[in-house]
Amino acid sequence: MKVIIGLGNIGKEYEKTRHNAGFIAIDLLLEKYKYNSIKEEFNSLVYTSIINNQKVLFVKPLTFMNNSGLTVKQIINFYKIDLNDLIVIHDDKDLNISRIQFKKDGSSAGHNGIKSIINNLNTQDFYRLRIGINKPANQWKIVDWVLSKFSDDELNLLKESFNNKSEFINDFTNNKTFTYLMNKYN
């Protein structure tokens, strides 16, 4: 079983915001890789798909970003998921818009959702797919920037870029190594 978790904040007011890039990515993946069922469990929406004969859970935590780690820990423990079978998708202000990059372990780099996951799993050793949202201009506070909405052009660019790399799911479900994914898609 594989688990792909997209980070974001719940609520209409957060739709299409930069901090919800993980939710946007999950929605794009679900358009391409149809799901068989959806249920609410562990404070999250869990969409179940079968891809390459492999069960895949696409997850959107229903907690706020700062508490995402609680959901991730519960899912990992309940389904007995090896961390090599987990990818967390999140926004990253240090990458340009439309830049999509795989990363293995490391610090949170100030991302509160990732910080929550690290704290709850007691490890930094999990795979991430970072989605660039650009650095804010000087007049922006970081918190205001990540909660601002993408422009239509930015959103289209992000969708196009992500869709071009969404084939990573096929490689991931065919048990390709994460190093392989980084070399192929970064």
Swiss-Prot record:
The record marks 91 as: Stabilizes the basic form of H active site to accept a proton. The keyword Lipid biosynthesis does not apply. The keyword tRNA-binding applies. Its main location: cytoplasm. It is an enzyme of class 3 (hydrolase). InterPro entries: Pept_tRNA_hydro, Pept_tRNA_hydro_CS, Pept_tRNA_hydro_sf. Monomer. Hydrolyzes ribosome-free peptidyl-tRNAs (with 1 or more amino acids incorporated), which drop off the ribosome during protein synthesis, or as a result of ribosome stalling. Belongs to the PTH family. This is Peptidyl-tRNA hydrolase.
